[in-house]
Amino acid sequence: MVTQNKKILIITGSFGNGHMQVTQSIVNQLNDMNLDHLSVIEHDLFMEAHPILTSICKKWYINSFKYFRNMYKGFYYSRPDKLDKCFYKYYGLNKLINLLIKEKPDLILLTFPTPVMSVLTEQFNINIPVATVMTDYRLHKNWITPYSTRYYVATKETKQDFIDVGIDPSTVKVTGIPIDNKFETPINQKQWLIDNNLDPDKQTILMSAGAFGVSKGFDTMITDILAKSANAQVVMICGKSKELKRSLIAKFKSNENVLILGYTKHMNEWMASSQLMITKPGGITITEGFARCIPMIFLNPAPGQELENALYFEEKGFGKIADTPEEAIKIVASLTNGNEQLTNMISTMEQDKIKYATQTICRDLLDLIGHSSQPQEIYGKVPLYARFFVK
């Protein structure tokens, strides 16, 4: 219980929506706990520190999944010593120092890989608990902050990854990845499908087209899935691509086994009401799917965290990787045509999923903050440190 005024500073990043969604889930949960003495502030560190350069980097990051895969692969799989020498380790340093001086937080929570935090924790005993929520299923060096108080990770295998690189096991908690609480609540699947003019007795294949950032080839995929999966219907989420939505509606407007949607706030309901999902393996998307126990097909995952997530889910029996649309269609047909494998995958997910990650993490954060004291050392040392590095 927080009985004195305390402040949590959340450092996040807007590279993709996942990190922001995790942050919002935690903020909402803490707000729901009605803690009068707790204030929570969040900052998109890189965007605030270097808005123009970060905007360029974000565009490159998004396009790297389509056009610069080898370049991103080289960055992601670089040796740790190369990352240590990269300017990225110091990116946002001045802004971070100023935030700590201004806000004087009692706890820092990272929901985005923030190597610059390591610069502070390695140079100073800042006496501020630092906790990290890791939003992927395999460890990458950028998630490690020396002298951290806590790491919240998705699985016991992820914890072992941390232990293998020398992290104290007592600092790593297997909590699952925090998602919106609505993914934990029951859904009347039959009624949802009926309300959307779909047949609850058919197997529903959910396709998230917006996740792929492309607008071609989905008409053929839908046609082939329906041709090879006799008892299937397809729900296509087009995201913000109005062109894709228009073209698919025109092609399938008379087909009662196809529903074309644009951007939707009802992914929870669709995941809960579908038997199989074709998507990209972003950490939050697949965690939401995991919570709803919907097996997934990962179409041509990009090297890096996407591929690592997909490999883990395939290894655990939660999903399958398809390198091409044709391979994805074959997998759909195999899983939906009376194959027990789909039922077994769902059963495995039911057994392995971790519930209520957000609540678990928030309770532990409150415990950490209850034992923290207002730091003093950093406020004397940081101004000199800032002048040394930033000028």
Curated annotation (Swiss-Prot):
GO cellular component terms attached to this protein's record: plasma membrane
GO molecular-function terms, A-Z: 1,2-diacylglycerol 3-glucosyltransferase activity
Coiled coil spans: none
GO-annotated biological processes: enterobacterial common antigen biosynthetic process; glycolipid biosynthetic process; lipoteichoic acid biosynthetic process
EC code(s) of this entry: 2.4.1.315
Main location, first listed in the record: membrane
Pathway: Glycolipid metabolism; diglucosyl-diacylglycerol biosynthesis
Location in the cell: Cell membrane
UniProt cross-references to CDD domains, sorted A to Z: GT28_Beta-DGS-like
UniProt catalytic activity: a 1,2-diacyl-3-O-(beta-D-glucopyranosyl)-sn-glycerol + UDP-alpha-D-glucose = a 1,2-diacyl-3-O-(beta-D-Glc-(1->6)-beta-D-Glc)-sn-glycerol + UDP + H(+); a 1,2-diacyl-sn-glycerol + UDP-alpha-D-glucose = a 1,2-diacyl-3-O-(beta-D-glucopyranosyl)-sn-glycerol + UDP + H(+)
EC class of the enzyme, as a word: transferase
InterPro entries: Diacylglyc_glucosyltr_N, Glyco_trans_28_C, Glycosyltransf_28_UgtP, Pro_diacylglycrl_glcsylTrfase
Transmembrane regions: none
Keywords (A to Z) from UniProt: Carbohydrate metabolism, Cell membrane, Glycosyltransferase, Lipid biosynthesis, Lipid metabolism, Membrane, Transferase
PANTHER family: MONOGALACTOSYLDIACYLGLYCEROL SYNTHASE, MONOGALACTOSYLDIACYLGLYCEROL SYNTHASE 1, CHLOROPLASTIC
Its biological purpose: Processive glucosyltransferase involved in the biosynthesis of both the bilayer- and non-bilayer-forming membrane glucolipids. Is able to successively transfer two glucosyl residues to diacylglycerol (DAG), thereby catalyzing the formation of beta-monoglucosyl-DAG (3-O-(beta-D-glucopyranosyl)-1,2-diacyl-sn-glycerol) and beta-diglucosyl-DAG (3-O-(beta-D-glucopyranosyl-beta-(1->6)-D-glucopyranosyl)-1,2-diacyl-sn-glycerol). Beta-diglucosyl-DAG is the predominant glycolipid found in Bacillales and is also used as a membrane anchor for lipoteichoic acid (LTA).
Annotated family: Belongs to the glycosyltransferase 28 family. UgtP subfamily.
Name of this chain's protein: Processive diacylglycerol beta-glucosyltransferase
